[in-house]
């Protein structure tokens, strides 16, 4: 996420707050800023440029989210606005805020374990319901491409795990 310098125009702070209200359509308890999808907010002349990185390049919600950003900006008088799709570097779960990880757990989805640079290591996947680490992978593919399906061996409940990407 862009660090806000003390010399940033006051509207930049307002825009970050505005964008932090746009929910992710697949996980509505998280916003696009919680996930780290908004990379930067820049004033360019009389308008605004928003850097946006989807969670993966084929994400079906990309156009919807770009439209939501444009609508929020326009509705609140921040025009003209240009949303720049930034695919490099690719989005990573490392960009998620700590608060987002906790809200995932409260929502019933086990948050990503570890960091993306260690994604090849088998993670200790904790059950979001009972906090047990005695879990079993059922399927690499869960309800969305970024999730895997697990079952807790302690409470026997199935749950989604947000893959470390």
Swiss-Prot record:
Pathway: Aromatic compound metabolism; phenylacetate degradation. Induction: Activated by cAMP receptor protein (CRP), integration host factor (IHF) and by phenylacetyl-coenzyme A (PA-CoA) that prevents PaaX from binding its target sequences. Inhibited by PaaX. It comes from the Bacteria. InterPro entries: Fe-S_Maturation_MIP18, FSCA_dom_sf, MIP18-like, PaaD-like, Zn_ribbon_PaaD. Possible component of 1,2-phenylacetyl-CoA epoxidase multicomponent enzyme system which catalyzes the reduction of phenylacetyl-CoA (PA-CoA) to form 1,2-epoxyphenylacetyl-CoA. The subunit D may have a function related to the maturation of the monooxygenase complex, rather than direct involvement in catalysis. PaaD could assist either in maturation of PaaE or PaaA. PaaD component is not essential for the reaction in vitro. The gene is paaD. This is Putative 1,2-phenylacetyl-CoA epoxidase, subunit D. SUPFAM superfamilies: Fe-S cluster assembly (FSCA) domain-like (SSF117916). It comes from Escherichia coli (strain K12). Pfam families: FeS_assembly_P, Zn_ribbon_PaaD. Monomer. GO terms for biological process: phenylacetate catabolic process.
């Amino acid at each position: 996420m862009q660090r806000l310098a003390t010399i940033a125009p006051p509207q930049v702070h307002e825009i970050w707050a505005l964008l932090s209200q746009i929910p992710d359509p697949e996980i509505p308890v998280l916003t696009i800023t919680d996930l780290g999808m908004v990379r930067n907010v820049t004033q360019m002349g009389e308008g605004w440029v928003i850097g946006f990185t989807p969670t993966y390049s084929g994400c079906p919600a990309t156009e919807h989210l770009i439209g939501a950003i444009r609508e929020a900006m326009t509705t609140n008088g921040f025009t003209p606005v240009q949303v720049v799709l930034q695919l490099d570097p690719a989005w990573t779960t490392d960009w998620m805020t700590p608060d987002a990880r906790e809200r995932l757990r409260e929502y019933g989805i086990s948050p990503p374990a570890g960091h993306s640079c260690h994604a090849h290591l088998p993670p200790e996947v904790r059950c979001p319901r009972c906090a047990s680490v005695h879990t079993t992978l059922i399927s690499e593919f869960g309800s969305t491409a970024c999730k895997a399906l697990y079952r807790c061996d302690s409470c026997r409940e199935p749950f989604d795990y947000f893959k470390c990407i």
